[in-house]
Swiss-Prot record:
Thiolesterase that catalyzes the hydrolysis of S-D-lactoyl-glutathione to form glutathione and D-lactic acid. Monomer. Gene3D superfamilies: Ribonuclease Z/Hydroxyacylglutathione hydrolase-like (3.60.15.10). The gene is gloB. Zn(2+) 1 binds at residues 54, 56, 111, 128. SUPFAM superfamilies: Metallo-hydrolase/oxidoreductase. This is Hydroxyacylglutathione hydrolase. Keywords: Hydrolase, Metal-binding, Zinc.
């Protein structure tokens, strides 16, 4: 059974560490090497793999130093993006074995064009595509691509744990409540999030089931969500609703 820990980095990043029972581990999106090296030393762990979702520096900045510290480490990442010291390029449909567990690679363009995610046994590492109560900004792709990527994630089993790369939950919930002020699950989640953050406890991972109740970007067919953007759209199809929500969030 794999154990997953969060290593905080920068102001709001999480570097996810995946550990097996014999002190071998992998990390996901190490934007900074030092907190990883400190954690590995403190817990006497050996780094065997680095998984990257996309090329932004706060996700790959620590890769070169980690490779220097662990020269035999495998660096897995998107085939279509410039990842330093990449050894194992991946794209949609590829599979990765990690400590006896198989992870399927999902192509998740939108935030960046080559963004990928890794889905294993009831767990998803999705970088900057899906956040709790929110989604990533569209820097390189199109709204249509981002909508399709989120739809791909939404089709996964609802018990899937979602390991996002940023602690954006509180600000995302504030926007979600602007969209759906009468959503009781969302109000309760706001209170839960505030309690956790007051204690400096991560709000992540989340679950896909929870996100379908509280995340407006996964609720684009909900009548209240559609109504909230009625003055911003000509068509009420889900992709148009998503696009309007994302534009609204950019201004929020």
């Amino acid at each position: 059974m794999l154990e997953i820990k969060s290593i905080p980095a920068f102001n709001d990043n999480y570097i996810w560490l995946i550990q097996n029972s014999d002190k071998r581990c992998a990390v996901v999106d190490p934007g900074d090497a030092q907190p990883v090296l400190d954690y590995l030393q403190a817990n006497e762990l050996t780094l065997e793999a680095i998984l990257v979702t996309h090329h932004h520096n706060d996700h790959i900045g620590g890769v070169p130093d980690l490779v220097r510290a662990f020269p035999h480490v495998t660096v897995v990442g998107p085939k279509a993006e410039p990842i330093p010291t990449l050894t194992t390029p991946m794209e949609e449909g590829d599979k990765l074995e990690l400590f006896g567990e198989i992870f399927l690679v999902l192509g998740l363009p939108g935030h960046t064009l080559g963004h990928i995610g890794y889905v294993g046994d009831s767990k998803l590492f999705c970088g900057d595509v899906l956040f709790s109560a929110g989604c990533g900004r569209i820097f390189e792709g199109t709204p249509e691509q981002m909508f399709e990527s989120l739809s791909k994630i939404a089709a996964l089993p609802e018990e899937t744990q979602v390991f996002c790369a940023h602690e954006y939950t509180a600000s995302n919930v504030a926007f979600a409540l602007a969209v759906e002020p009468d959503n009781e699950q969302l109000r309760q989640y706001r209170d839960d999030v505030n309690r956790l953050r007051a204690l400096n406890i991560p709000t992540l991972p989340t679950t896909l089931r929870k996100e379908k109740w509280i995340n407006p970007f996964l609720r684009t067919t909900n009548p209240d969500v559609v109504k909230s953007v009625a003055n911003r759209i000509k068509n009420s199809d889900p992709c148009s609703v998503f696009t309007a929500l994302r534009e609204w969030k950019n201004e929020f």
